[in-house]
């Protein structure tokens, strides 16, 4: 492992001293290591990134999401040093950075391949690449009103309901927006997709888990509605068609996981006790 990328979120508290320390830790493990620094993911999706052996993300979970989308087609593994608030995906704290880098070069880690989603818009040129690691969300526009949605799974009608929106999430995204919408926490290596309605106007409409190979069609039934598509809570697009198709992408996010990190411990400390942290916000 000689080619290392570092993707820095410039909105976070990352001093030059921190970056110098990381360079030092890397070169202590491999004096010949070549380090390429990216700022706010700019240039990360270029073909040259294919040569990287791993990318370290300095930021929060949102920075991980952006990095995953940029690198998906290159199969480059990533891991995060948390400089955000929650740090569920960016699970390495700054004080553990040196240990993580040492384990990286010793090969003391595993790689988890996480499902990603793709979205096709009916009748729209596919030049836009709608990839998501967490979720793809279809909601109403600016007006505060509910919208009527019809859901088809593998071209078979599933249900129709009115709601604020619809979330289609991966197992990775099950601890994000869909959790707030009443969806279950899904173990990350399961091959499933989740549909979670947002504030449905019915007591009988609940989240559902589907086979990971399912094709999900969401139709907006009122012609005067201009739905909005949101990718991982970061990319935003007004949709001029009334139907979107969401399915599993051929690309996966490759997350580096170190052996001293336990999923359930992270779940307990980062999610279960989140309410205590929020009291002071």
From Swiss-Prot:
GO molecular function, one term: metal ion binding
Binding positions (NAD(+)): 61-62, 134-135, 145, 164, 175-180, 234
Keyword terms, alphabetized: ATP-binding, Cytoplasm, Kinase, NAD, NADP, Nucleotide-binding, Transferase
Catalytic activity: NAD(+) + ATP = ADP + NADP(+) + H(+)
Highest taxon of the lineage: Bacteria
Cell compartment(s), UniProt: Cytoplasm
Family note: Belongs to the NAD kinase family.
Protein's recorded name: NAD kinase
Native source species: Clostridium botulinum (strain 657 / Type Ba4)
